[in-house]
Amino acid sequence: MWLITASGAVRTTYQYKTHAGASTVHNRVAASASMNGPRRLVTNVAVPTLTSGHRALHFLPDRVLIREGKNFAEVPYQRLELTAEPVRYIESEAVPRDGQIVDSTWQYVNVTGGPDRRYKYNRQLPILLYGRLTIWDDHGLHMIWYVSRAELAEKVAKALVNASSVPPPIIQP
């Protein structure tokens, strides 16, 4: 699992050739999923959490608690927008054990997509089918998470959609 921290489009022929023919380049950080909520919050339920470095999403029963370093914010499920989709990803690092390889390409490609024979060490890279979960709202939240099994992103998205259909609690003074 990874959190995408930056991405950019491949625009020039040189970029296309040196990025294995990819159309977009990502900077990603390793992430993990757990059932541990924030340390300072005591709950009587397990809190599903996605963590990556100093960022975390804690899925509480009525809202999402977002941690960025020492700062916290909350977003009701009703304000969240999300998409889940399978994506083809050129993997230049170690292939996850549960990853599904669907194709392969070369580290350095020519314009037609074949191997660029000018490079002595031009390794073949696997193309995997990953799941992309995008979570955003109208107030600035925009996070893209990649998971090594495409169907997991869809399951998480369905669970979040179901959580958003539950009306928020009414707090009486």
Where do the PLM segments sit?
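A composition-biased, non-transmembrane "mature-region" signal
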Residues: M1-P173
